[in-house]
A protein has these predicted regions:
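A residue-level signal for conserved active-site and pocket-lining positions in enzyme catalytic cores
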Residues: 22, 26, 139, 168, ...
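Catalytic palm subdomain of template-directed nucleic-acid polymerases
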Residues: 221-236
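Common nucleic-acid-contacting/processivity interface regions adjacent to the catalytic cores
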Residues: 6-107, 111-114, 154-197, 201-205, ...
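Cytochrome P450 catalytic domain signature, combining two hallmark sequence patches
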Residues: 117-126, 236
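Short beta-strand
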Residues: 212-217, 254
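C-terminal, non-catalytic extensions of nucleic-acid polymerases
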Residues: 233-475
Length: 475
């Protein structure tokens, strides 16, 4: 920090060790994150830095432009309009269900574009399908080579196939992008429509076999396998059977099996695998923006709910309440602090407040206070960690906020009522999974006058049949 000049004069070796640590960390991060960009820079007409900064749409367009300029052919103008169709997403069962199989159509949109002769109307040279077919062949060849490769070579090949995959997956988006030179909204809609019909066909086959579809999400289906389909081998065989029912070039892959699933809402669920690992999708249950104790509580409560351990849920809730009341934080202030990143300058923030465009916010007020105390300029992108302390009745949130480093475990001053209320808010996320509001309140309440009895408390599973599926599909 500010003492670096003094440390350099007094202990230069310490600074050199610090710098070497930075270089080592950067190299290791680059090894994990930069491989695909390195190989992309060999394919697209961009230097490495530009390839790292630009999005996939710009890379695809650069390939098209290079091909057309090389052929001395004029470039088309972007088509005006918008895409109408989208991916098929829906949820048919909410609650705790299992076992679960996840089947997905491998490379759904690229497979459709290759097998249904999709290309933009403005692509006079037919470059779209040729590039897509070439990249797909390169990716499959690279993935095949990975199977027998050693660790270092395998990592290099994986970076290559990832770079191919990133480009391949961008072709569909390019069709529906309003500013792309080679866009074609009608073709983008056709791809999405075929994708929807393929997924409806998969759903229909699963239901006809006796399975229960939980959720469909653009290119995959989560479902309870039919009676008699038990175990890894049988589940894989069932998915292979689904693949055999698809048109040529469309393959359904087995993408995982799970012991239980907590289905919350569309694109928001938790999966418990057979090794006890918990996987979350979406942010409705667990969000990175909430306090650390809240994330931990939701994860632990979800694991217990998946096991249908009602007594354990009640004990967990009471344990967190006691810890908050007793200022017993496992990781100190990091357990309950909030961390926010400043997205505007302090001047812009103050102007918006004065113009009633936004209320005062704790992070900005504390950042301004820090700037006054240190005499330095507070910049956009700085992070502010804070908590809410006990305050007089009627105090606004930003007035009760304190910087996290001010919290003293020997004299804790965080607002216990506020953090108890936060715990109740986290617990409220589980109310939809109980049969009645009374059942929910029994579990997430400290009122144990006659002792807690989990018997009679029922979980709720709501199921609706998938929409009536058309018999006609485009294959």
């Amino acid at each position: 920090g500010n003492a670096i000049a003094q440390v350099w004069r007094e202990d230069p070796e310490r600074i050199l060790r610090y710098a070497l640590d930075d270089v080592t960390e950067t190299e290791r991060l680059a090894r994990h994150l930069s491989g695909s960009t390195f190989y992309l820079a060999q394919m697209v007409p961009m230097p490495y830095g530009q390839a790292a900064r630009t999005g996939p749409a710009a890379k695809i367009e650069a390939l098209f432009v290079r091909g057309y300029l090389h052929a001395r052919h004029s470039l088309p103008k972007a088509e005006w309009g918008s895409q109408v169709m989208g991916g098929y997403t829906d949820v048919f069962i909410t609650g705790v269900v299992g076992p679960i199989v996840y089947a997905d159509v491998e490379s759904l949109y690229p497979s459709i574009m290759l097998n249904y002769d999709v290309k933009p109307a403005s692509d006079a040279l037919g470059l779209f399908p040729r590039l897509l077919r070439t990249l797909t062949a390169l990716r499959f060849t690279t993935k095949d080579a990975m199977r027998g490769a050693d660790g270092h070579t395998r990592g290099e090949l994986d970076a290559r196939q990832t770079s191919y995959k990133n480009l391949i997956n961008s072709f569909y988006g390019n069709l529906g992008f309003g500013m792309a030179l080679f866009n074609d909204f009608a073709e983008a809609d056709r791809v999405a429509s075929v994708g929807q019909d393929l997924l409806r066909s998969i759903i229909r086959h699963i239901r006809q076999a006796g399975g229960r579809v939980v959720e469909v999400d653009t290119d995959g289906v989560l479902f309870v396998p039919p009676p008699g389909v038990e175990g890894d081998a049988a589940e894989r065989a069932f998915v292979d059977g689904l693949s055999d029912l698809m048109p040529p070039g469309i393959r359904v892959g087995f993408d995982g099996r799970f012991r239980r699933m907590l289905s919350y809402k569309k694109k928001n669920y938790a999966l418990l695998d057979y090794d006890g690992h918990l996987k979350f999708k979406g942010s409705s249950l667990v969000s990175r923006s909430i306090e650390r104790f809240g994330r931990r509580f939701v994860r632990e409560a979800t694991a217990l709910l998946l096991e249908e351990d009602i007594a354990g849920l009640h004990a967990l809730f009471l344990g967190y309440r006691r810890a908050i009341q007793q200022h017993d934080w496992a990781e100190g202030v990091e357990s309950f602090q909030r961390i926010e990143t400043l997205k505007n300058t302090l001047d812009a923030y103050e102007r918006d407040v004065n113009e009633n465009k936004r209320p005062r916010a704790a992070a900005y007020e504390l950042a301004r206070q820090r700037g006054v105390e240190t005499g330095r300029t507070i910049r956009v992108g700085e992070r502010v960690a804070y908590y809410l302390a006990s305050a007089e009745r009627g105090a606004r949130g930003f007035e009760a906020a304190r910087v996290a480093e001010a919290w003293d475990p020997a004299a804790p001053d965080e607002s216990t009522p506020y953090y108890l209320d936060r715990l109740d808010q986290f617990a409220a996320r589980f109310e939809p999974f109980f049969a009645t509001p009374h059942d929910f309140r029994q579990v997430f309440s400290e009122e144990d006058l006659f002792g807690f009895d989990p018997r009679g408390i029922r979980l709720r599973v709501d199921e609706r049949p998938p929409e009536e599926l058309e018999d006609d599909v485009p294959f």
